[in-house]
Amino acid sequence: MDEKLAKIGGLLSDCFIHELLEDPYITDISYNGKEIFYLDNRKGRCKFKCDITNDEIYAFLRQISNLCDSSFSLSQPILDVSFLNYRLNAVYKNLCRKKGEKVLTFCLRKFNLNKIMISEKSDFTTSKILKFLGFAVKSKMSILIAGATSSGKTELQKYLINKLNNHERVVIIDTINELDIKYNENVDITCLITDLKQNIDLKDLVKLSLRFNPDYVVLAEARGAEFEDVLTSSLSGISTITTIHAKSVDTIIERAINLVQINNKNLNYETIKNTILMHFDILIYVEKVIQFDGSIKRRLTSLKFIINGEPIDLIDPNTNDLLIERIPEKIRKELVSEGL
């Protein structure tokens, strides 16, 4: 491990939130200038009892920023760094207030790099739907996953990557190291991470990935014009698994079109729509549902299979299970032969 990363690990293991960092169910920790809150996947958002001052918070953040070769001060008031299995965002006190007082704030997001959370035993979706999605990636179908923040998009990507055929070449593209976990060791996986200090962004890496001769390009999240390059790569016969933010299942296509139009405002709406529907095979929508007791459930709520440019819903609204009879006969026979 890099010496600086080792020092960060030591700092975190003995810091004021170390017990939260050690809990595998906690994914987000935030400080609003006075209180610390955390997001527990079992209990929802909770308040953490901790007596700490803004000065102590600043010392903690300053240490991390220095070890990440970044600055955090009045002149550099926004900190955005990734390290180990964390992403830290902090705001200096000249930009933030709490009851009129200048304060620091931060949000620390923690990623699970040890295991894949979705399985046929989880309540994310049914075993039939997961088996169908496993078949889809083995058949090199392109998949677009949409949902709100923290709805399970990345976890679904991890599950799908782990279902790829042996000896396939996969290039994963991300702004952080969230998807770099232990997968099937017989799949050839390369992870490319952006470096904004060197002006290397997602768009650059998508173009670079094509030179690796991949079977699949996995873009952790399309936020802007790089979505057009993913779409272009599909024209070359390269399959993709990509996520985007969308408010509902009905806005997935519109959101994807908007991303393409960022640098191409004059492109025809219907032309872009038809291109998307031609080169993606599956559209998925996932949701984060907050229960009455505050606990959180993440579920796959929509699965559409694109047939001749038309998205066909594959989830039975009554059973929430796979409508296998809507799948084209040739594919359906293959699924049945594999035990679905």
Regions found by a protein language model. Name each.
Residues 142:
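Walker A (P-loop) ATP-phosphate-binding motif of ABC ATPase nucleotide-binding domains
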Residues 145-147:
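Hydrophobic anchor at the beta1->P-loop junction of P-loop NTPases
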Residues 1-20, 292-340:
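NTP-binding/hydrolysis catalytic cores, primarily Walker-type P-loop NTPases
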Residues 1-46:
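N-terminal anchoring/assembly modules that precede and organize ATP-driven motor systems
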Residues 159-277, 287:
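Switch/coupling sub-region of P-loop NTPases
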Residues 153:
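Conserved lysine of the Walker
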Residues 150:
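Walker A (P-loop) phosphate-binding loop of P-loop NTPases
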Residues 39, 43-139:
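P-loop NTP-binding catalytic core
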